Amino acid sequence: MPGNNRNRRNNRNRKKRKQYGFYFDYTLLFVLVFIVGFGLTMIYSTSSYTAQIEEGDPEFYFRKQLIFTIIGFALMIVETKILDYHYLKNLAVVIYIGGLLCMFLLKTPLGITRNGATRWIKIPGLGQFQPAELVKIGTIAMTAFLIVKAGQNIKKFRTVIVICIIAGFAPALLVYVLSSNMSSALIVALISVVMTFVAYPGYKIYVALTGLAAVAFGAFYSWIKKMAASGNMTGKFRLNRILVWLNPEKYIDDKGYQTVQALYAIGSGGLFGKGLGKSLQKLGYIPESQNDMIFSVICEELGLFGAFCLIALFIVMLWRINHIAQNAPDLFGSMLATGVFAHIAIPVSYTHLRA
């Protein structure tokens, strides 16, 4: 009977909770709720003008984000009250393959092209969804699954390479090829690298690889600095974005416009900002101010003090996630928490550096 099966599953979950010990981090919950509430407030503040002009509704972007926020909290409640995270071990491959298949929907009529890039798909009744986000979740689950499956073989560096290729590099390549989304592709790849780095007991190879990467980065930075100083653009879109980021004033009338306007916003905010909702740069000066450049508007409205408080909240969140990863009852739980840590830390660092 379906009812009996459900009762048996609930009993198994309760037994697992007793076996491993149920722990709820209320500090993490408080910080999470505060950041989400703050994020919704700033999305409304930064997007209301643009939404009114483009959609005829100042709450358009805010409402979309609110819907997904409610869905997210509902799933969190179900996860903490009913399910046990160990079920993800059985669904890891399904989530992983599902994320990859969703990427191909970008090439169907469901794909939404905006500013020359197709990165979103339509979901009837809900709005839009970025398949790369599901790929990130699939990468976390699949990497954790493969690490647990590897057992003692995780001590072999070739096992680490295989896991990174299967769970991280291959999905990252697919994300980049199908959506031209370099930032999401890098996040997917780095999530698997961070997780395997934590799981792999050796460190000498990573030290050597880090040294080689530092030398390569130093050479590249020296070359790109000279390019930026000369003001010459290349034929490569990604390189041009780096050139503009390093020297935006040289391209203020073209590709450097958004970066310069973001710098104006940060500089004009001062220590305590102009006040919530009083940004001038969001009034059409910063394109897509509610997206990648939202941090610059936060600096303008709340000042450096508000920006540092937000960064401090993210640091507390990452600290609590790290605590959970270190004290998880098993390797799979530890790896899941590590993946979540990387999933948050990498884009947060990227967004703040970009602004």
Please provide the spans of the model-predicted regions.
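Alpha-helical transmembrane segments of multi-pass membrane proteins
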Residues: 35-47
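Long extracytoplasmic/lumenal interhelical loops at the membrane interface
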Residues: 263-305
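Short, Lys/Arg-rich, polar N-terminal cytosolic tail immediately upstream
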Residues: 1-19
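Helix-boundary and loop/linker segments of multi-pass membrane transporters
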Residues: 21, 286, 328-329
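Re-entrant/interfacial helical elements at transmembrane boundaries that shape
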Residues: 278-282, 313, 354
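N-terminal membrane topogenic signal
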Residues: 18-31
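Hydrophobic alpha-helical transmembrane segments of multi-pass inner membrane proteins, especially
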Residues: 33, 45, 55-254, 296-353
